[in-house]
Amino acid sequence: MMDYMIEAQDLTKKYEGLTAVDNLSIGIKKGEVFGFLGPNGAGKTTSIKMMVGLLRPTSGKVIVNGKDIKNIEKGTIGMCPQELMLWENLTCKESLNLMADMYEVPKNIRDPRVQKLLDDLFLSEKADTVVSKLSGGMKRRLNLALAVIHEPEIVVLDEPSEGLDPQSRRVLWNYIRAMRDVEGKTVILTTHIMDEADQLSDRIAIIDHGKLIRLDTPANLKKEIGEGDVVDMKLSDPLKNQDLIQELTPQEDIISVVEVKGRINIRALNAIGKLPKMMQRVEKLGVVVEDISVRQNTLEDVFIELTGTGLRE
């Protein structure tokens, strides 16, 4: 029997006849980072809310560490929302102490825990700084610290890197990995940053129209759409995009051609070798290529292949 920390069994959520989540069954293993991907309105947020007890399903149930979710202990789950939930008039240390008191963390455990979080998330020098004076990156790291001050077994991160600079993002990623690798926590991650999902997730669920359409490792998901590289180009006249797609689709060894956010993605075998013929088709249409790159398959390519839409659409 698989050792699941969270198991969703046939979860369905309906709103006045609209099915937001449709018969979803997912098992999240202990000690893994589990990523959720889906376009806006796909049902991923509703799914997660049901899986952590914030929303009652229309039907189905959720088992957390062998117990019905209605019977789990207070503090089993830590939530780090995308919106910053901070006390602007308190210092970092005061904020962490207050949250620890809310969870009734004993003082002999609280004090070293607060200091460790300040150290691990590079906030020690700002421990006595009022939150309103922190940078955006520091506030987001404090937001995470508040979510885990009580040592939850499960941590839910909703767009944790939103708006962060690369340095702050790297600090956050390293801490997320440490929660899994050192502390053995189960982490549920939602993100629009494809590199983040790829780098951090052990497995990823792709949700669309309230249904689970794929669940696998990032590597296996990228293998699933097959061989070939992707030529990503932007034309001087976006109105010609569909004309170029029609020109290229019959070509040999071109696997797929799609328009994504005003650009054309061409997945092909020996993509670099195909560039001269592609350029001939562009010239035939009387337009020029403003920007072009050749890359390997990404998770976003997987998503587009499976759903026919971009992640932010």
What do the PLM-derived regions correspond to, one by one?
Residues 60-75:
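Conserved ABC transporter NBD signature motif
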Residues 151:
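Conserved catalytic motifs of ABC-family nucleotide-binding domains
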Residues 52:
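Helix-to-loop junction immediately C-terminal to a conserved catalytic motif
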Residues 97, 101, 108-126:
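Conserved ABC ATPase "signature" region
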Residues 130-134:
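Conserved ABC ATPase signature
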Residues 174-269:
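ABC transporter nucleotide-binding domain
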Residues 155-158:
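Catalytic Walker B motif of ABC-type/P-loop ATPase nucleotide-binding domains
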